[in-house]
Amino acid sequence: MIFSILEHILTHISFSVVLIVMTIYFLTLLVNLDESIGFYDSSDKGIVITFFSITGFLFTRWIYSGHFPLSNLYESLIFLSWAFSIIHMVSYFNKKKKNNLNAITAPSAIFIQGFATSGLLNKMPQSAILVPALQSQWLMMHVSMMVLGYGALLCGSLLSIALLVITFRKVGPFFYKKNKKKTKLLTDFFSFGVLYYINERNSIFLRQNINLSFSRNYYRYQLIEQLDYWSYRIISLGFLFLTMGILSGAVWANETWGSYWNWDPKETWAFITWTIFAIYLHIKTKKNGRGINSAIVASIGFLVIWICYFGVNLLGIGLHSYGSFTSN
């Protein structure tokens, strides 16, 4: 009873803090640069609080249930939200490269946690005895690597989608108008790391009366470079986790079912996901692999990940059916 109450409290704390963080972030779009710095510091600290709240929830559930909390969809969703907070923590402590990845991590975390605690999964929050197939030491290794991989790949793919939006968006006078608040409103939403730099450079360019067409291209180039930089590194990390998850899952499958690979729906879509992001990384090794081509592949991968993670669970068939919506 005590553990259930503690889980409930920690879950709601993390959800509330993420909601506040996202609200603070969007409030910064309405204030000028000097006033927004304090808001950004607060939102960063909020993500840290969220990280420790979810960590406490996972440990509490682990102690209460007696097994690593990754046995059903509800627990994996909470773990995925935790993965997004880790991504933000890494960028938060990277002082050399200022960025605002909470533009991706905060909305993603609140969406995932909101879905996990919604009525669709009202039966799953109750901890249950593991089914025989999950009673293995490989549970922690395999599922944690897969979910961490999903989180990193989703985050990197969203950055690639933002890159495409910036690249193909028509440049209008509104985007580069001298009104700082309007300029900040658009650049802040897509910059994820060059907010301070762009606004400061914008003021310098306007004071020096540098050709407007040059400054437009300069701002767009800076945004695209930063988005490409972070998406490549985060996707590379996610691909590593995904590879480790697939390999450990193959070993586990051989121990449980007597075969390394069975081409069940989950395995098939995991392989498709791995292939798409392998193509992405291959494109990035080419001289012309930066920018649009790789971003398009990553955007396709974003959809494939959700099919692999949720679509297969909707079917509730195959060897991984215990993670479906209908499973308790």
Swiss-Prot record:
Belongs to the CcmF/CycK/Ccl1/NrfE/CcsA family. It is a multi-pass membrane protein. InterPro entries: Cyt_c_assembly, Cyt_c_biogenesis_CcsA, Cyt_c_biogenesis_CcsA/CcmC. It comes from Aethionema cordifolium. GO terms for cellular component: chloroplast thylakoid membrane; plasma membrane. Pfam families: Cytochrom_C_asm. May interact with Ccs1. The chain crosses the membrane at residues 13-33, 46-66, 73-93, 101-121, 146-166, 234-254, 263-283, 295-315. Keywords: Chloroplast, Cytochrome c-type biogenesis, Membrane, Plastid, Thylakoid, Transmembrane, Transmembrane helix. It is found in: Plastid, Chloroplast thylakoid membrane. One of its GO terms (biological process) is cytochrome complex assembly. This is Cytochrome c biogenesis protein CcsA. Required during biogenesis of c-type cytochromes (cytochrome c6 and cytochrome f) at the step of heme attachment. Its main location: plastid. One of its GO terms (molecular function) is heme binding.
